[in-house]
């Protein structure tokens, strides 16, 4: 009996020494600042309701490069422009992949889309289809008539409610949905309640946290709270919808060429040198919806919020637009090119309110060094675009202030070359639809301030317009933006 006891104690002692030495070697090898976590869950409890804000606060204490653990998963958090450059440019290829995600795999056709597909040949092929065939400058210009028609309908809707409170948040979401529907699918689905409800479910679930993805032995929590059931139902409903859309295009003759038509033509004619199947078509089209509708409407919503909170900025923008357009009833896309203050307003809104404050996670595919730190393969990377937009070293002491003037004499742009402002990402994983999104945002905002004078409605209190944010993958206002339009004087 004593021998067995002694043997057991010896085994425990040896195992303890081995574990201790491994941990010690790991600490010597990786000296990254790391907030203390809890057993099993790591730092998950520190994310809070708004992770981009919580992680920004932690970075003020632990630095712009810190290592957290979400359950068993090591997560590197980047909160400065300089370090974002290292990840997205210097070591772009190493960090170009995406981590596994139960939610993305279930909702995005097992990651056959462009945004969540792991780095590799399939992703390169699908990215080239998007860049060359869907979001080329030629394609963006070809849908100008769609943008003009939908903006005209929006302006008429506002005109009919002149001097009455209008829900600008709802109007902007509707406009964006209608434009994306016509461009991607060939017709509008915005009036269909089932479609609206489905897209709301999809966007909400994409921003939902899955416990099981980070703490596998707690995966039962996802089942208990109904997440697994919601994912299954929504994935099936989404697939049925897009399958019906694709089949309608296969069966019918259409006058206008939309994204589905383009993808089907590529599949039929084999013009890209590789095969594109039905699943890939549906996944890419869904990417357009997820990446286009929520993010564009969010940016316009926040831009109008800030302009209404800062009447002097609104007045200066109106003066610029009205000076260039004079008595014209609408603003054209050519005239936008001469509106420097409008572009500054868009940049400032993107700085303070990036639609995706935490960029879609990256993952290292091999060991790499960032400065003096060793980053092992398989490390997830979260780039906090929201925190980078508030770096005092870059933007000055007034980082929390909405001041478009800061961009007028600045070369910083949002197209991925300046890492101080990366709302659309950078490097290999940069959003391929930047031009499409920006032209819509600019022309909508210009027309809103050209045609009408605006003031906040009593339904939108000062507190609501200031800081209240929703939760989800794209950060909207928590409360709808109500404003009152009046005819220009």
Curated annotation (Swiss-Prot):
Residues the entry annotates as binding heme: 431
Annotated compartments: Membrane
Cellular component GO terms held in the UniProt record: membrane
Residue spans crossing the bilayer: 1-21
Broad class of where this protein is predominantly found: membrane
Cofactors required: heme
EC main group: oxidoreductase
Any one GO MF annotation of this record: iron ion binding
Family annotation (InterPro entries): Cyt_P450, Cyt_P450_CS, Cyt_P450_E_grp-I, Cyt_P450_sf
Entry keyword annotation includes Secreted: no
UniProt similarity note: Belongs to the cytochrome P450 family.
Protein name: Cytochrome P450 71A26
Organism whose genome encodes this protein: Arabidopsis thaliana
Name of the gene: CYP71A26
